[in-house]
């Protein structure tokens, strides 16, 4: 009888560990490597390499992680994500669809302008508020998790305005 009880306990323990391992193994390792391409913005005549611009890490960039394919008011917010100094963030996620939204895009328009500063009209041209509202609802990175993966997240900046498509620089060119 003791042998039967011992075998039963061992089988329950092995089965329980197998279930626990299965739940943990459902999470996949996701590494996101973020860089921004910054163009050459004028000045002295550049070499071809300098004229091509350069890539810079998205160091300390802050995003909000949501589950789903597209951003809607019903999108499930999961957590804040902050890139490290190398523009890298490592996550453990279940298989599915996800997207990142810049943290400042979730602010109200007034809060966004206060955080990013007013636009000087003699140097910059702003699009209508509808452009900003659409941009603020657009995911910065969409991805699907199936297995462990590394995702290259690339953005393109414009001279003197960064990655915001609703602002254009109209000031004088660089000397």
Task: List each model region and its residues.
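Sec-dependent N-terminal signal peptides
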Residues: 4-13
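Short beta-strand segments within Ig-like beta-sandwich modules, predominantly Fibronectin type-III
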Residues: 79-83
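A short tyrosine-centered beta-strand micro-motif
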Residues: 96-102
